Amino acid sequence: MFPQDTLTIGGKVFTSRLMLGTGKFTDFHVMRDALEASGTQIVTVAIRRVELKAPGHVGLLDALDLSRYQLLPNTAGCRTAEEAVRVARLARAATGVNWVKLEVIPDPRWLLPDPIGTLKAAEILVGEGFTVLPYVQPDAVLARALERVGCATVMPLASPIGSGRGLRTGELLRTVLDGAGVPIVVDAGLGVPSDAAQALEAGADAVLVNTAVAEARDPVGMAQAFALGVQAGRAAFLAGRMAERTHASPSSPAAGVPCLPDPEVPV
């Protein structure tokens, strides 16, 4: 394989290209086992929607071994740039972590990110010393603008959050990947490991998955399967795919094939 192939985000080096979310799991035990099976090193948590520390019982941060994972608080549930900035600041105060997965989503039906609000919040948070990983639609112009303000990655969606519809934005993703100066992490909508493999084959640097694992019949098994899909996709990208052709091309050489008489033609 490719032992020196690593992912660098915000000055930190990772060997796994699979990020995992912590929502929707039936309990913390299943979540922990899925994280372990996935081999992930970056774990995202929704600051507005969970009890990070819960007096009298185990909270989410208590359930995570933070010596093993880079915590990535996210601003899920924030509808405006101002809300997202406020939640990011609260997350840093609560966790001591200056990483943030920036989500500004005013649309409750399709959960599509607001490009203007995202860029506005990103500029503020980068200026305050955050390592910002913004969730966006696959828009190459927006991606470059986020790079310019100092975002550590860009995270274009594959399809709507939680839909499991797979990589429906492939052509647009290619425009984001073309000339990208920061890691591109495909986020949202991936349903099965082959979706993750497809994203990595296209040149994405990593993927983030949550619902596809948490809602699987066997979340731990699916987490392991996604890890293998990511590894396969990345290995295929590095190996370089064959050129596509519009016509058939025989895999066996014609040279050296004996010229046999046509049985329909009398000798």
Swiss-Prot record:
UniProt GO BP: thiamine diphosphate biosynthetic process
Main location (coarse class): cytoplasm
Catalytic site: 101 (schiff-base intermediate with dxp)
Superkingdom, natural source: Bacteria
GO molecular function, one term: thiazole synthase activity
Pathway noted in the entry: Cofactor biosynthesis; thiamine diphosphate biosynthesis
A GO cellular-component term linked to this record: cytoplasm
Catalysed transformations (reactions): [ThiS sulfur-carrier protein]-C-terminal-Gly-aminoethanethioate + 2-iminoacetate + 1-deoxy-D-xylulose 5-phosphate = [ThiS sulfur-carrier protein]-C-terminal Gly-Gly + 2-[(2R,5Z)-2-carboxy-4-methylthiazol-5(2H)-ylidene]ethyl phosphate + 2 H2O + H(+)
Location in or out of the cell: Cytoplasm
Region (Disordered) residue spans: 247-267
Positions contributing to 1-deoxy-D-xylulose 5-phosphate binding: 162, 188-189, 210-211
Family label: Belongs to the ThiG family.
Function according to Swiss-Prot or TrEMBL: Catalyzes the rearrangement of 1-deoxy-D-xylulose 5-phosphate (DXP) to produce the thiazole phosphate moiety of thiamine. Sulfur is provided by the thiocarboxylate moiety of the carrier protein ThiS. In vitro, sulfur can be provided by H(2)S.
Protein name: Thiazole synthase
